[in-house]
Amino acid sequence: NIDKLPPIDVVTISHAHYDHLDLPSLKKLYKINKDTLFLVPMNLGKLLKSAGVKNVVEMNWWDTITIKESLITFVPVHHWSSRTPFDKNETLWGGWWFETDLSKLLHLGDTGYTYDFATIHNELGPPDVAFIPIGAYEPRSLMKNSHLNPEESIQAAIDLKTNKAIGMHWGTFMLTDEAVL
């Protein structure tokens, strides 16, 4: 129940796809806590604002914002963005790097395999924990450029030199042809 959540300081959105951006949920979150800050990819803010969510900051790749002594950086990944058949790549997409004095966390959102993983490591260092997507990867002929399969997810963890990798983006929505893990 969304009403039972504690106050939320920040919500990050990776891209516009419906499985990553549920407007009714964001509207409810904003309604119960108008102080929540919504960090979104460039050009996606107008969608949230049109739904009544006003506390929105758009970010470009490598933009960093400081919130309560935490650094949050929007990082590039290999994906795409749209909400309709007519708005492909009109908004940006990406992952989120969270850094405090105690730890570094990386959430990759959706991504295909890319040299950006090594670049993220070179720019920001190794994450203590990386949330790496492993779902919606079959058939490879269609999904290779936008979703990691399990083997590529392992290579992403190696490229990032993360201390711990946690697989995500599987078993929630039946999006493609792979078997449920």
Kindly give the residue locations of the regions a language model identified.
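Conserved phosphate-coordination/catalytic loops
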Residues: 20, 87-90, 111, 144-148
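Active-site metal-binding motif and surrounding structural segment of the metallo-beta-lactamase
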Residues: 1-39, 55, 125-131
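Alpha-helix capping/helix-boundary segments
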Residues: 17-18, 44-45, 63
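Cap/insert and terminal regions of metallo-dependent hydrolase folds
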Residues: 10, 37, 43-46, 112-181
